[in-house]
Amino acid sequence: MTSLTQFEQLKTAGYNTIPVYRQRLADTDTPLSVFARLKDYTQAYLFESVEGGENWARYSIIGLGESTVFSCNAGQLTIKNAQGNITTQSCADPFQYIRDYQSQFKVPPHALIPDLPQFTGGLVGYFGYDAVRYIEPRLSNVPEADPVGLPDIWMMLSKTVIIFDNLKDTLFLIVHANTTDEEAYQRAQNQLDYLERLLATPVSLQAKKHKAPHFESLTGKEKFLESVETVKEYIRAGDVMQVVPGHRMVSDFDGDPLQVYRALRHLNPSPYLFLVQGHTLTDNTPFHIVGSSPEILSRLEDGIATVRPLAGTRPRGKTKEEDLALEQELLADEKEIAEHLMLIDLGRNDVGRVSKIGKVQVTDRMVIERYSHVMHIVSNVQGEVRDDIDALDVFKATFPAGTLSGAPKIRAMEIIDEVEPVKRGIFGGAVGYLGWHGEMDMSIAIRTCVIRENKVYVQAGAGLVADSNPESEWNETQIKARAVIKAVELSSNGLIL
């Protein structure tokens, strides 16, 4: 608990944004029951994690967005400030805007408040795949506008956070106080009192049935198969070694995004489980992003940058023996191994761009991780970053993931622009946070759906190399999308298994 004396000491030390917190038992609450009490807020999020597809991680994070939100689309930066006023300006480099914006918050380092988890707030949201166009000038040939209608980048300021310690069955209630306000400490205490009252209110998680979904590919199988052949021609010509084209599926939706999240965390527990809800600033319509991504884009923590290439896929077996046979088949597949080794090299190169010389290493090499419907080959690449590098530098060096673009990365993305009919939107981008202390954790937006204006969208891709079989690659996209589609179906049935 933050005392008034401690608060004043931190204020005197020059910190202008100070976490005021309480810790209490949470043995009768769950992250889901807490989020259910917050889900009517305009901006909110829920982050959970299952490590290796099997064990729940220590912390679950529930956050409320503040009034401050910003988004960027087609070079236009739209900002909603703390007073609710909205302005728009041209912006060639949104990353510099983010860097400048975050620099105004002087938050005490973790060492001064060691009881708190590493992440206690910051900026939360997403970078869509097309955010790469603010990084790489060659990618200026933008496909048609994304009919889903979400911006390339969307971030909310998060200063009110509830963090579950799943190991100790406790939770932290955290409110960040602005010390320029003379009543800041008392206002923070009042907000904590409000959160306590909110958590004490009854909540129902009773799921309701709604209209069953019917997903259709907007590209269609025939056009996807044609795109595979087009990509293979580029590979044969020596233009590129690998490309990862995808396609989008859509269905009508009149259900509850939280039910979809509950279904997805049951069906496909993953390292990155997330539900992000917000409103677009241009037309003030709500959206929800629900995902169970198995793959990190990049992480920066304690000066170590991490990427975790995931490539090589098989469906899960129906029996333990079949599952093991499929694992052995996957590890013996020369195409899959070649593709994965290519992506390890790409990950080493990306991390190497921001790391000290000789400080990049592969810490895990080609291990199998199992999820509900698929198994993958996974490796882990880490680097000790240079002293002049920050989280956004790491993000820009690693974005987008090679597993969602190809190699060489920029040429592969040019080909994706050619064969995919519209902007990708969130698919292949990243969802996560930029913390107060320079830490970052971003997952790749795969195994993810977007819910907006009574529609639900699911996308999936396939990594193509020279000997790819078009029919097999189409089937791979169906396998990858299966968990999310099944989650939408399960939610429509009232979560009755």
Curated annotation (Swiss-Prot):
The keyword Zinc-finger is assigned to this record: no
Alphabetized GO MF terms: anthranilate synthase activity; metal ion binding
Protein name: Anthranilate synthase component 1
Gene Ontology biological-process annotations: L-tryptophan biosynthetic process
Entry EC number(s): 4.1.3.27
Catalytic reactions on record: chorismate + L-glutamine = anthranilate + pyruvate + L-glutamate + H(+)
InterPro entries: ADC_synthase (IPR005801), Anth_synth_I-like (IPR019999), Anth_synth_I_N (IPR006805), Anth_synth_I_PabB (IPR005256), Chorismate_C (IPR015890)
Positions annotated to bind L-tryptophan: S49, P271, Y272, L273
